[in-house]
């Protein structure tokens, strides 16, 4: 199912799954389509990551996520051009958790609330009906992602717990920071 989001038509709000949310940080000037990815989106996801400071994975990772995890991944397109995505999965050992692997937003859409909208779309899907926690790993220097997950906790009026996940000495080379786990929830009382 594709959802059309046209913020100007809703006086600063946006539609996700037919629900109106209010007060995004900035208004988008165009229509953004939010939905499930197809394998054809994998290459565009990889290209978006390569234009950013995100950890680069192989193109295969993005194509594979689109093929086998489309229910837990989200893409945003402007005039058929990919401008944002979330890759995520439900860990087999923790069916009440959605683990967000990566969020990418094109520079043309940063600061407009698109990452929040993508997360809201993900959480609202039927596959997440038993999910009570959102988890992600974030480096200490990634203040934007930290703020995004703290905002998500505020939106759900719940906790955002931060703990060490992977220390920097686990990563090969000298250029990878530690990864902190951000755990948001419970989402439902």
Swiss-Prot record:
Tell me the keywords, alphabetical order.
Acyltransferase, Transferase
**GO BP:** ectoine biosynthetic process
Q: Name one GO molecular function term.
A: diaminobutyrate acetyltransferase activity
Q: Under which pathway is this protein filed? A: Amine and polyamine biosynthesis; ectoine biosynthesis; L-ectoine from L-aspartate 4-semialdehyde: step 2/3
The protein's Enzyme Commission number:
2.3.1.178
Its top-level enzyme class, in one word, is transferase
Q: Which family does it belong to?
A: Belongs to the acetyltransferase family. EctA subfamily.
Protein name from the UniProt record: L-2,4-diaminobutyric acid acetyltransferase
Q: Which organism is it from?
A: Halalkalibacterium halodurans (strain ATCC BAA-125 / DSM 18197 / FERM 7344 / JCM 9153 / C-125) (Bacillus halodurans)
Q: What is the lineage of its organism?
A: Bacteria, Bacillati, Bacillota, Bacilli, Bacillales
């Amino acid at each position: 199912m594709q959802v059309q989001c046209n913020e100007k038509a809703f006086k600063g709000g946006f539609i996700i799954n037919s629900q109106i949310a209010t007060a995004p940080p900035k208004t988008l000037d165009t229509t953004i389509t939010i939905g499930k990815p197809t394998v054809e989106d994998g290459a565009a996801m990889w290209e978006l990551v390569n234009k950013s400071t995100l950890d680069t994975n192989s193109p295969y990772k993005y194509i594979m996520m689109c093929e086998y995890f489309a229910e837990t991944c989200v893409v945003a397109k402007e005039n058929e051009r990919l401008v944002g995505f979330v890759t995520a999965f439900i860990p087999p050992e923790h069916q009440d958790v959605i683990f967000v692997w990566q969020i990418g937003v094109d520079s043309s859409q940063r600061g407009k609330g698109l990452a929040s909208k993508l997360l809201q779309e993900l959480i609202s899907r039927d596959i997440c009906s038993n999910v009570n926690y959102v988890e992600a790993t974030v480096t200490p220097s990634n203040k934007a992602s930290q703020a995004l997950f703290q905002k998500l906790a505020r939106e759900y009026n719940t906790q955002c717990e931060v703990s060490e996940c992977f220390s920097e000495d686990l990563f090969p080379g000298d250029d990878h920071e530690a990864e902190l786990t951000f755990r948001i929830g419970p989402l439902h009382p």
